[in-house]
């Protein structure tokens, strides 16, 4: 069976890219189609794959600020020629599900989420801390993007949701049924440890919608030790909010992460996420998880 993998953008490392890497291992001969690709910013494993990019990859500055080119992505994915395949498997949180499906080809969408800034523009812009005037400027475009997104969803043969929360959003925004398959999580290397530290832990990309500020402010006010592992464009703002008990350690090497997880007092997961891989790894390490009571975390964290 000839399979094409389709992914929104390969310019960052996170849970979506972990899912793509797992799909690539399942289908080792499948090329990866994506809008943009910055090999230096993602796992080296992708450099061994056949990654095919769209014309959008040549736009200036897009590797670091793809949000500026929001309207380019629907057209970028429509430009791919996927004839010659038996199956298209899209790993979607943005616009990649909008690829053209040739006659006779099946399209399965592994839906990380219906596109946030298409269906929840106000909330997305508030979480990302854009200029307050931007919603009014973008609102006329949202009607077009929502119609485009719905038409793209109509062309998909089968939807797979990563959590119950995403399944409900697929039904609400696309009017489609879906099955739930939780994302693959590497838990084999995470084990409980008899050595315990006295710190709380956050492991995340430091971007506004992850709401790491809630954990930073809570631990600062309560004078509790917190280690924040990860990096991103929100780091400077978070450091300005932090008290002396909050330590930012940057991106932690994968080899060091299991020990950091196993020794924490508890793992904090403050955002409204679609699923959440790091909390599952923390539980595999035998550590309790404190999560915001919404989103995908409700599938695996119980009070």
Regions found by a protein language model. Name each.
Residues 26-97:
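Active-site donor-binding segments of glycosyltransferases and PAPS-dependent sulfotransferases
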Residues 127-159, 167-168:
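Membrane-proximal helix-turn-helix segments that form the acceptor-binding/catalytic region
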Residues 168, 172-173, 184-198:
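Acidic anion/phosphate-binding donor-loop and adjacent secondary structure
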Residues 191-227:
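Conserved donor-binding/catalytic core segment of Leloir-type glycosyltransferases
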Residues 236-258:
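Nucleotide-activated donor-binding/catalytic signature segment of Leloir-type glycosyltransferases, i.e.
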Residues 262-274, 287-288:
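Acidic donor-binding loop of glycosyltransferase active sites
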Residues 276-280, 297:
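Short glycine/serine-rich donor-binding loops of glycosyltransferases
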Residues 288-291, 301:
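Short hydrophobic beta-strand element within catalytic cores of glycosyltransferases
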